[in-house]
Structure formats: structure tokens, C-alpha cells
């Protein structure tokens, strides 16, 4: 069956202008991924067990506090009981019942309540986060350690994400949370063998760099060329000054714009009014008109052709871009704006992965092992004595991975860290 499909699909590669993506990116990546899956990464079971106990203790404390605020015990993990407590007994506004007759208590609802200063909602969000970390990671990962190797061996898929990004399963190592201290601690359980260290190499702000390339935004290109803090530069352009607050707001705006955020969405992230958020969006587009032009041109192309295209020729299709259903259409529009950027980023790191093994071997570093790929990051294991030499090779390959197929107008920055664990390497 696979061979029959290959004969059929091969005929479509050239007309779809996808030959280079297949021949130079995806096909040569298959043996690389196979080797990474076989290697796996060592996991320290004692770290996971300790974190599981700590999370359980934190959950127990939160449970007591939540029950105290509610005035009665109830099952926090039950959406039905939580909804009745919040909107029935406690009488908070904003409760909406679905077709099942139950109040919605999803993350959006709880974040809205927490944003109003409602303490119980914030504590439930914290409890849920801990429950997720405990069940999905600290407990589940212990069951997925191979008893023969002491390592976990994730499975990668080239077709798991629409934009060309890799996905992983059993376990999914792409979604380990890094925004919270508890989430970051989970990476401490991924460790090197005795005598080795973990090396993390991460593309720095690659999507913003690619946006500057796609949109031909000179101030942003100039900032990246000079190695400036891009969020500080945006803060200066929008607010006229740089401090912790303006830089934080500028960072939120930088990333939000690339995902086609609405003024309502941005107002929630900035905790501002919708009018204030719209004023910032307008100011951003006025200061960086190339971004606005890129968004408009991308939308026009996708509406006309039904797809977007990366710099390498990979197409992402959006069949619902003209849907009469507003929610479906707007969702496709937001995804279409970012797809060329995210897809190009995925193609670049795949190119780096294909070139990495031969380059390390040529430098006498064939024993350096590439273990994981997580979005814009590559994770290696190597002897500590080889860190300096390996870092030079890894940085060079990642920085030049787009060439000669694509000539970027912005440099690709690479951040490298090392340590006894994945967490310590950050």
C-alpha cells in the first residue's frame, strides 16, 4: 500500500512545487529521527518521584484553601460541582450553561474570574496545572521509562502538524510546560549519563526574525543585525521608553501580532481596554507598516489560492478560510498569518538536523548524540570536554541551515547552554 501511494503522490510533487521540501528536508530527516528515537534520553526516576510528591502536597494545600473559600468540600476536578459552587452558591457573574445544562468552567472562564481578583478561581487554575503536571508528566513518565535502557524513547511524526512542525508521542515531549517554575522542574529529570552533559541549542526569537524577513521590516532587521534586544527596541518605538513594564508589553505585542490577535484578545493579555489595545495595534502597524502589508498580502493569497507557502515551498492548506461560519473562518485567518513563518522555522531546524550528524562526524565529534527536537530547540548529549568544539559546529550548522536554498535578510541567533540535566542546560 505504501509503495502504491508513493507512486501516486510522487507525480504530484513537481506540479505542487514540493520536490525540494521532500528531497532536501523531509526524506533525509527520516533516518535522523529513527536514530534519535532509538537513542532516547535518560530519565532520573527519583526526580520524577520527588516532584510527584511535591505536587501532591501543593494540591492538597490548595484543596483545603479552595474548600475554605467555597465554604464546603467538593470535588475540584468536577466541572459540574465547580460550576455550581462558583455561579450557584457564590453567585459570581459570567456563568454560562451549555447544552448539558452545566456551567462552563474552562480555562477562559476561570482566567476571566481570576482577572477580576476572584481568589478561588486563581487557586483552581493553580490546582488544575499541578494536576496536569502530575498525571501527564511526573507519574506517566515513570511508566514510560524503558527498563532495559533507563531512557524514554519518544516517537516523532513528520505529518503530525499542519505547518510542517514535528510532533512527538509516547511520550509527547513537545508540550512539557516551561512557563511556570513547576513545569520547568520536570526538565530536571532528563539527565546525561555519568561523564556526559546535556547541551541545549535554541534558535533565538526565530519567528520574529523570519517575520522581519517576510515583511521586510528595516528597523527590526537592523535590530537583529546589531544584536539588540528586539522587545526593548519595540518598546522604544511604541512607548518612547524602555523599562520592565514597557518591554513586557512590547514582548506580548510582538508575538501576538504574528498570530493575528484581535483587539479583544490583546486587551486580555495586556489587561487593558479593547480601545487601548486597538490603539497599540494601530501604532504597531504605523511604525512597522511592513508587518501590516505582510498580513494583508498573506490573507489575500490564502483566500485566492487556499494555501500559504513557506520559503522552502511547503504548502499549508486552509479549506475553511472562506467558511460562512465566522469562528471557523477567523480561526483559519489567524493560522494563515503565522503559517509561512512557523512553517519556514520548522523547515530550517529540519535542515539543521539533517546536516548535523555529518558535520559533527567531519569535525571528529561523531560521538556527540542528538537526542531531542522540541520546536526551535535541539538537545544533545556529549562528554563535557567536547562542549566548546561541539558548540562551534552546532552553532554554525543551525545558523546556516537555510542556505543555500534560502537567503535570509536577518541573521539566525543561536543560544547554547549545558548542564547535567535538560533543565540545567537552560
Q: What annotation goes with each model-predicted range?
A:
Residues 198-200, 207-241, 315, 319-329:
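Metal-dependent catalytic core segments for phosphate chemistry
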Residues 38, 146-149, 153-154, 158-161, ...:
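Conserved catalytic core of nucleic-acid polymerases
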Residues 87, 210-212, 424-426:
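Short conserved micro-motifs at the rims of enzyme active sites and ligand-binding pockets
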Residues 400-413:
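Flexible helix-coil linker/hinge segments at domain or subdomain boundaries
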Residues 1-179, 184, 195-197, 204-207, ...:
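Conserved "right-hand" nucleotidyltransferase catalytic core of DNA-directed polymerases
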Residues 390-398:
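Short amphipathic alpha-helices in soluble, non-transmembrane regions
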Residues 191-194, 363-366, 371-375, 392, ...:
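A structural signal for short secondary-structure junctions
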Residues 76-77, 201, 223-225, 341:
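Conserved, non-catalytic sequence blocks in retroelement Pol enzymes and Pol-derived host proteins
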Amino acid at each position: 500500500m505504501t509503495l502504491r501511494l508513493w507512486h501516486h503522490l510522487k507525480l504530484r510533487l513537481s506540479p505542487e512545487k514540493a520536490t525540494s521540501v521532500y528531497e532536501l528536508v523531509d526524506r533525509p530527516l527520516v533516518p535522523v529521527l529513527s536514530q534519535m528515537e532509538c537513542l532516547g534520553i535518560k530519565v532520573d526516576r527519583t526526580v520524577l518521584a520527588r516532584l510527584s510528591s511535591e505536587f501532591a502536597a501543593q494540591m492538597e494545600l490548595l484543596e483545603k484553601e479552595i474548600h475554605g473559600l467555597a465554604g464546603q468540600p467538593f470535588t475540584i476536578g468536577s466541572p459540574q460541582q465547580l460550576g455550581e459552587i462558583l455561579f450557584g452558591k457564590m453567585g459570581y457573574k459570567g456563568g454560562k450553561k451549555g447544552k448539558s445544562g452545566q456551567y462552563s468552567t474552562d480555562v477562559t472562564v476561570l482566567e476571566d474570574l481570576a482577572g477580576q481578583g476572584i481568589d478561588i478561581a486563581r487557586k483552581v487554575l493553580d490546582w488544575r496545572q499541578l494536576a496536569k503536571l502530575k498525571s501527564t508528566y511526573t507519574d506517566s513518565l515513570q511508566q514510560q521509562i524503558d527498563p532495559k535502557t533507563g531512557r524514554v524513547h519518544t516517537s516523532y511524526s513528520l505529518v503530525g502538524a499542519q505547518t510542517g512542525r514535528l510532533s512527538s508521542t509516547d511520550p509527547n515531549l513537545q508540550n512539557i510546560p516551561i512557563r511556570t517554575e513547576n513545569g520547568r522542574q520536570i526538565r530536571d529529570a532528563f539527565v546525561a549519563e555519568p561523564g556526559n552533559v546535556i547541551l541545549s541549542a535554541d534558535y533565538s526569537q526565530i519567528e520574529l526574525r523570519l517575520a522581519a524577513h517576510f515583511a521586510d521590516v528595516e528597523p527590526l532587521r537592523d535590530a537583529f543585525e546589531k544584536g539588540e534586544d528586539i522587545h526593548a527596541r519595540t518598546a522604544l518605538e511604541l512607548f518612547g521608553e524602555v523599562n520592565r513594564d514597557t518591554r513586557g508589553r512590547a514582548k506580548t505585542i510582538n508575538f501576538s501580532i504574528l498570530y493575528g490577535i484581535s483587539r479583544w484578545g490583546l486587551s486580555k493579555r495586556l489587561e487593558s481596554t479593547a480601545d487601548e489595545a486597538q490603539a497599540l495595534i494601530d501604532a504597531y502597524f504605523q511604525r512597522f507598516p511592513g508587518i501590516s502589508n505582510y498580513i494583508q498580502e498573506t490573507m489575500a493569497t490564502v483566500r485566492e489560492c487556499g494555501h500559504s507557502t513557506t520559503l522552502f515551498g511547503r504548502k499549508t492548506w486552509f479549506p475553511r478560510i472562506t467558511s460562512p461560519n465566522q469562528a471557523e473562518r477567523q480561526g483559519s485567518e489567524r493560522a494563515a498569518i503565522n503559517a509561512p513563518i512557523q512553517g519556514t522555522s520548522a523547515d530550517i531546524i529540519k535542515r539543521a538536523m539533517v546536516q548535523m550528524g555529518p558535520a559533527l562526524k567531519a569535525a571528529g565529534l561523531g560521538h556527540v548524540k542528538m537526542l531531542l527536537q522540541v520546536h526551535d530547540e535541539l538537545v544533545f548529549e556529549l562528554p563535557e570536554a567536547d562542549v566548546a568544539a561541539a558548540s562551534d559546529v552546532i552553532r554554525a550548522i543551525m545558523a546556516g541551515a537555510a542556505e543555500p536554498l534560502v537567503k535570509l535578510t536577518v541573521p539566525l541567533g543561536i543560544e547554547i547552554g549545558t548542564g547535567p540535566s535538560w533543565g540545567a542546560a537552560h
